[in-house]
Amino acid sequence: MRSVSFASAVALCLCLAPEMLAQGGGGRWRRPEEITNRTGAFFTDIAGPTADGDKVADLATLELARTAKSANQMVVLYLVDGGDDQDTREQFESTLFANDELGIELKFFHCARIDLAKEPALKTKYTKQAPLFVVFDASGKPVELSMSGYKPQTSALSKLLEKQAAGTVKPSLAGFAKTYGGIIQDLEQVLSKKKQALQKQAKAGGDQGKRAEADKDVKALEAEEQKILTKEKDLLSKVRLPERDAKAQRVGAPRWGGRGGAPGGGDAGGGRGAGGGTGSGGGTPAGGTNGG
C-alpha cells in the first residue's frame, strides 16, 4: 500500500480544511465525485447460482464467472447477509473500502455482491464464513477470504487481489495502484485549490485587482489539472480495465443524507468514462470496476 509522508498529509489537510468545515467539522468531508469515481469500490448486486432445495451450484457456474473466464478477466464476489445489523455492515464496509489503493485494485476485477438473505441455500453453505470474498483469477480459479464477525481485513484482501492478478496485470497490481494513487492524490489537491480559487473569483465582485488575481490562480490550476489528467490518460492507456456495470453501486460510501437499503445501498456507479475527464456527469475514467 502507498504510504503518505507526514508533510504531504498535512498539506492535503490544509487544502481540504475549508471543505471539512463546510461539512460541519469533526473531520468529515465529502470528497469530489471525480475522486470517488476513481477510488471507490463499486459492486453490482446479482443473484446467486441455481439451487435445488438445500443444494446450490458452485459459484464458478455463475454467468459472470463463466463470461469473465472466457474473456481472461478476473472476478470478485462479495457474499454478505443483508439481514444482519445494518449499522454493523455499513461500518465494516466503510472501514474495509476506505483505502484508495484497494479501490484502484478492484478496478481490474468484475465486482459483484450477493445478498445471502435472499439466497437460503447459499446462506446455509456460507453463513459461518460471511462476509466472504471469493476472488477468481483470469483462469477461473477461486480463492476465498472470510471476514466473519465483520472484522475488516483491508490488507489481506489487497494481497489476495494482487496474488490473483499476478501474471495478468503487469508488472504488478500493487505497483499500478501505487502509481495511480499518487496521480489521484495530486488531482484531489488541485481540485480543492481550484474550488477555493473559483470561490475567491466569485467573491471578487467589482474589485478588478482581486478578480485579476483570482483569474490568474484559476488559469494556473486548470493548466496543472490538465497535466495531471494527461499523466493519468497515459497510465490508463497501458492497461485494460473491465467495463463498470451501469447498475454498479459504490460500497462503503459515507452516509451523508440518509441510509440506503439492504444489503448496503450506495452511490450509483455510472458507465465507462471517456478517460481523463473530471466532470461529475460521466463515469469512471477509462474503464470501471464492475461486471454484472
Which role fits each region the language model picked out?
Residues 202-213:
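Charged, low-complexity interaction regions
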Residues 128-172:
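Non-catalytic, surface beta->alpha helical segment in thiol-disulfide oxidoreductase systems
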Residues 7-19:
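Bacterial N-terminal signal peptides
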Residues 21-28, 245-292:
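Disordered, low-complexity segments in secreted/periplasmic proteins that are enriched in proline
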Residues 83-132, 136:
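Conserved segment of the thioredoxin-like fold in thiol-based oxidoreductases
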Residues 217-247:
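Amphipathic alpha-helical coiled-coil segments
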Residues 26-103:
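Local sequence-structure signature of Cys/Sec-based thiol-disulfide redox active-site neighborhoods
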Residues 153-203:
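Charged, amphipathic alpha-helical linkers/stalks
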